[in-house]
């Protein structure tokens, strides 16, 4: 649903100067179209949401699941463009937020970067080899438990957070 700017699409690509500069640098203009519905899949009766690459940074994608009700979330990614930096760890950290917001397990499978599982309470298990978590090959086996509850965040989303801040601001003002 969300394309990577300059990797999967070029903003303002129809403006001649932008098209000329980008084509000169890369050799082509990517023309990928975003999906129009969530990637809900089902295996052995278990429904799950598939997020591609950086879609896990958008809370509204996973929070808007009340109707489709997947039991867990899978993120497939290739984080090689981050290199050996903090990037793959920061990208993986978004899964902690998504797991806590939705009350579901989040499984990230990465061809490069971090492969791991985040439980609904935010605990992480990552594929490791000799302490390394990046650019390793291996198999990770872990039991996950599909869940169907709708969390308070899924029901209220950003409005719930806004209400909390309004209440806190009111409490602070009343003390003054």
Give each language-model segment a name:
Residues 1-176:
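Enzyme catalytic cores with a strong preference for nitrogen-chemistry domains
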């Amino acid at each position: 649903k969300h394309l990577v700017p300059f990797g999967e699409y070029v903003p303002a690509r129809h403006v001649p100067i932008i098209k000329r500069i980008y084509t000169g640098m890369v050799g082509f203009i990517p023309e990928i179209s975003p999906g129009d519905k969530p990637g809900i899949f089902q295996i052995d009766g278990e429904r799950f949401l598939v997020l591609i690459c950086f879609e896990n940074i958008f809370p509204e994608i996973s929070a808007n699941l009340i109707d489709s009700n997947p039991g867990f979330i899978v993120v497939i990614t290739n984080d090689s463009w981050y290199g050996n930096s903090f990037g793959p760890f920061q990208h993986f950290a978004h899964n902690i937020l998504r797991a806590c917001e939705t009350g579901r397990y989040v499984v990230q499978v990465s061809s490069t970067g971090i492969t791991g599982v985040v439980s609904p309470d935010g605990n992480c298990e990552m594929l490791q080899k000799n302490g390394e978590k990046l650019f390793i090959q291996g198999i990770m086996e872990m039991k996950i438990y599909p869940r169907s509850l709708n969390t308070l965040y899924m029901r209220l989303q950003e409005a719930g957070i806004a209400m909390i801040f309004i209440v806190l601001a009111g409490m602070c003002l009343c003390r003054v």
